[in-house]
């Protein structure tokens, strides 16, 4: 689960991580009032959306007086920001972070992520802050320094100091930088984060080390023990179809194609998308109904797929292990009747009770195309969609 920058900074502040003073504003008047309360000569107005690249898209402005605060707030609030992370549809800006400006001397990058290869948290840092870390990793990987953290003992002071020296933090500020990284790590662990990214971390003319931006992503499976974090969820920033899918324990991710996919198991779902692409089709979604699908689940999955107006056909690809093929067949028939499906539907069943499942489909009287294999099903749906 993602949260907004201003929320992330509030979380970090509670762990002793230094961040600029700021206030969130939902209207132009609130933005002006927030700037007055901050009482600073220069303030920064930042669009609050769940996406990076806001500065390049015009979502970050520096205001030097209250008139500029008002002008920038009027120009940003209610507009749709399109960045490299939002997709072409962009995201509407419904809130601003009004933050005090600071005298930036140098920008750095600091982040914590899970490293699956070592099953450890890794602290990454670079003196190339303010730019996309992926870009730095691709062009100048030698500028990224890493410390792998033993989960039994946590981040050690010597590791944080080594990172600070490697990225050339001024020696008089190393102590502050170490405190910053230790606080960031505590927040990461105690709040069950999957990502904690500070880009940029800055040193200032006043001799401070602070986070000018904060991206925190939380493990959705751990939210049951973090009610305070769950309350920060902004449903307006999430895809409505993904929200609906989560209510039925369906894993749904929208894509840009026109062939809806309903599959059980993440691996089979990815293989299904691959084989559709292989036969020159374009999947419209990733949808994993899981191992315990019921007729109700299948019906809801159909409804979610069909809520995408780009979908021109559906491919159901089920391997019945825990799940029985006859249950899926009944669910497909029920869903087809309920939604009044008029689009081409190809169904491939394999596994437990497969013959019974096929019999149920064949005797349904509905226009359902049976497939003997995954490749056969992919070719048929691509052909039917045209």
Swiss-Prot record:
Alphabetical list of Gene3D superfamilies matching this protein: ATP-grasp fold, A domain, ATP-grasp fold, B domain, Succinyl-CoA synthetase domains
Gene Ontology biological process terms from the UniProt entry: succinyl-CoA metabolic process; tricarboxylic acid cycle
GO MF annotations, alphabetized: ATP binding; magnesium ion binding; succinate-CoA ligase (ADP-forming) activity; succinate-CoA ligase (GDP-forming) activity
ATP-grasp domain boundaries: 9-244
Keywords from the named record: ATP-binding, Ligase, Magnesium, Metal-binding, Nucleotide-binding, Tricarboxylic acid cycle
Cofactors demanded by this protein: Mg(2+)
Class of enzymatic activity (EC top level): ligase
Assigned EC number: 6.2.1.5
Pathway: Carbohydrate metabolism; tricarboxylic acid cycle; succinate from succinyl-CoA (ligase route): step 1/1
Annotated catalysed reactions: succinate + ATP + CoA = succinyl-CoA + ADP + phosphate; GTP + succinate + CoA = succinyl-CoA + GDP + phosphate
A Pfam family of this chain: ATP-grasp_2
Binding site for Mg(2+): 199, 213
SUPFAM superfamilies linked to this entry: Glutathione synthetase ATP-binding domain-like, Succinyl-CoA synthetase domains
Residues annotated as binding ATP: 46, 53-55, 99, 102, 107
Co-factor binding details: Binds 1 Mg(2+) ion per subunit.
The protein's assembly and partners: Heterotetramer of two alpha and two beta subunits.
Biological role stated in the UniProt entry: Succinyl-CoA synthetase functions in the citric acid cycle (TCA), coupling the hydrolysis of succinyl-CoA to the synthesis of either ATP or GTP and thus represents the only step of substrate-level phosphorylation in the TCA. The beta subunit provides nucleotide specificity of the enzyme and binds the substrate succinate, while the binding sites for coenzyme A and phosphate are found in the alpha subunit.
Family statement drawn from the similarity comment of this UniProt entry: Belongs to the succinate/malate CoA ligase beta subunit family.
Protein name: Succinate--CoA ligase [ADP-forming] subunit beta
The species this protein was found in: Bacillus cereus (strain ATCC 14579 / DSM 31 / CCUG 7414 / JCM 2152 / NBRC 15305 / NCIMB 9373 / NCTC 2599 / NRRL B-3711)
């Amino acid at each position: 689960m993602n949260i907004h920058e201003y929320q992330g900074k509030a979380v970090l502040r509670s762990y002793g991580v230094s961040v600029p003073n700021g206030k969130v504003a939902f209207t132009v008047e609130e933005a002006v009032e927030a700037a007055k309360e901050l009482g600073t000569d220069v303030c920064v107005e930042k669009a609050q959306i769940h996406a990076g690249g806001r500065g390049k898209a015009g979502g970050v402005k520096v205001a030097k007086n209250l008139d500029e605060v008002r002008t920038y707030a009027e120009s940003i609030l209610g507009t749709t920001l399109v960045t490299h992370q939002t997709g072409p549809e962009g995201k509407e800006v419904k809130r601003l972070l009004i933050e005090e400006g600071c005298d930036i001397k140098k920008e750095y990058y600091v982040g914590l992520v899970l490293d699956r290869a070592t099953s450890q948290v890794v602290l990454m840092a670079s003196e190339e802050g303010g730019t996309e870390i992926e870009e730095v990793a691709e062009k100048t990987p030698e500028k990224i320094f890493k410390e792998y953290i033993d989960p039994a003992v946590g981040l050690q002071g010597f590791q944080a100091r080594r990172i600070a020296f490697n990225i050339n933090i001024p020696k008089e500020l190393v102590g502050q930088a170490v405190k910053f990284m230790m606080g960031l790590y505590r927040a990461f662990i105690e709040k069950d984060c999957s990502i904690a990214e500070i880009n940029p971390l800055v040193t200032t003319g006043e001799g401070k080390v602070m986070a000018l931006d904060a991206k925190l992503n939380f493990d959705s499976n751990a939210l049951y023990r973090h009610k305070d974090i769950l309350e920060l969820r902004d449903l307006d920033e999430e895809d409505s179809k993904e929200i609906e899918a989560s209510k039925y324990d369906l894993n749904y991710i929208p894509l840009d194609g026109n062939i809806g996919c309903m599959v059980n198991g993440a691996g089979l779902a990815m293989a299904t998308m691959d084989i559709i692409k292989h036969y020159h089709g374009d999947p419209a979604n990733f949808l994993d109904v899981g191992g315990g699908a019921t007729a109700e689940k299948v019906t809801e999955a159909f409804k979610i797929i069909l809520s995408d107006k780009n979908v021109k056909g559906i491919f159901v690809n089920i391997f019945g292990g825990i799940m029985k093929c006859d249950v899926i067949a009944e669910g497909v028939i029920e869903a087809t009747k309920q939604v009044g499906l008029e689009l081409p539907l190809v169904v491939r069943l394999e596994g437990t009770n497969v013959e019974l499942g096929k019999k149920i489909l064949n005797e349904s009287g509905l226009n359902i195309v049976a497939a003997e294999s995954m490749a056969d099903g992919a070719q048929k749906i691509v052909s039917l969609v045209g």
